[in-house]
Amino acid sequence: PRGKHPSIQTRYGSLFDLIEPHPGSVDIDDIALTCAREGRFGNRTKEHYSVAQHQVLAAILVWRRTHKHELALRAGTHDAHEAYIGDIMTPVLWALEWEAGPAVVSAMKTLKARLDKAILQRFNLEPLVAIHPGNEFISDADRQLLMWERTRFMEVPGGLWDIDEEAIYKLTAKDFGLAEDSPLLMALPAHNAHGLYWNMLRRLTRGWGLTGGLAEDADLSALPELNPILAMEMDLAFKIEVAS
């Protein structure tokens, strides 16, 4: 083993400890910008579609199904660890398990869990216990988005994926509270995804009365704003429908 913990340098120059990540070392804009630049599916989409936008859409789905700011924020940060370790695709993990055994996958789960905990604590949250029903809302949204994104942003697959596709609910634009041609459902370039992610964070932390890392970070006015059209679409997506 190494004499000291492995760490990585963030965009802003600080070193981030991967073994004992501290909530105070989590820079929220570093997550927002890095996830906006990180492409889903190993950047193999037809055009840039980011991890940041994926998380925003997950937050929208969970919000519309629960109307709980906290759960929606958890959905909106469920892949935030990828800002530090990248998007290690599931087939790659399976290949590593094939070559080196289950210890590799177990180690990756442990690493992700540590990072997730530090990121959540930056927002004054703690990880949910395994049996918490909120986990199911988040995992359902993640699986459903996987299939929706594949159809919308990738080429037609040359064979079946190793997933029970028939068991997964097929999303439509209505699930997001949006029209089919909404720009929010189009693949956005990194600079728009960066602003989109911050819009989600501001919206959910303000609505829940949670400040956490946002209040402690640099001047919020210097952070990216979302263009007005996308901001209006976010208003629609996060609107609470009142039954007549």
Model-identified regions with their sequence ranges:
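Metal-dependent phosphohydrolase cores
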Residues: 1-244
